[in-house]
Amino acid sequence: AEGVEKEKQVHLFSNYATLGIGNYGTLNAELFVNQELTANDYVGGMFRHLSSQGGIKDVELKDSFYDTALDLTYGVRGNELAWNLDLGYQNQIYNWYGMPMGFGSSLFPSDRENLIDGINPQQSYNNIYLGGKVEISDNIVKDASLKFNHFSDAFDSSENRFYVKPTFEFGIDNLAIKTNVVVDYLGGSFEKNYFNSNIDPLKYE
């Protein structure tokens, strides 16, 4: 129609990086890269980091934290078959620095200081995963995704999760049927319970 102007196509970037710096020594960084290897296959990666050096006023325990993650992917795109494989790792280190009101107020100042110095508020978490997805044309299995994730922490906690989710699509007479099936397993263990009174690790599935 007359007078209608076509919008300018938005330029999309395959790679980008961001960096932010704030008070308390805060650093926020992110890097994403994607590279076409051939007309059909590609690789990609994502790096993320968020941290603070701490220093909050009147906090008597260490209050810094770190959160770093790396994700990698490789994929192939075809007319009848497309798939990708993903690998990732995340490390988080936190200091749980909160204390009850009046903590150690009944002690002599030197004894209270020694008590606080003996507290280790640090906890670390680790996640590593491997997963992928496949899409198939003209097949009863339309697509399927799967992922394995392992979690651990500084206190010997451990957790494994594995799931598979295929999608089936087929026809019966003139009826089209599409359904998902999910297989999801979760299991792990804790070295100590809340009261630190157990002898053997606590396991669950």
Task: Pin down the residues of each PLM region.
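N-terminal periplasmic/intermembrane-space "pro-region" immediately following the signal or transit peptide
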Residues: A1-E7
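Transmembrane beta-barrel strands of outer-membrane/channel proteins
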Residues: L19-I21, F47-H49, L85-N91, A144-H150, ...
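Outer-membrane beta-barrel translocator/receptor signature
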Residues: K8-D58, K62-T68
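Internal metal/ion-chelating core segments
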Residues: Y163-E205
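Outer-envelope beta-barrel architecture signal
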Residues: H11-N15, A39-V43, N79-L85, I140-A144, ...
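Flexible loop and strand-edge segments within Gram-negative outer membrane beta-barrel domains
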Residues: S52-D71, D86-K165, S197-P201
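Gram-negative (and chloroplast) outer-membrane scaffold detector with strong preference
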Residues: G75-A82, N127
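Residue-level signature of outer-membrane beta-barrel architecture
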Residues: Q35, V76-G78, V134-D138, F168-L175
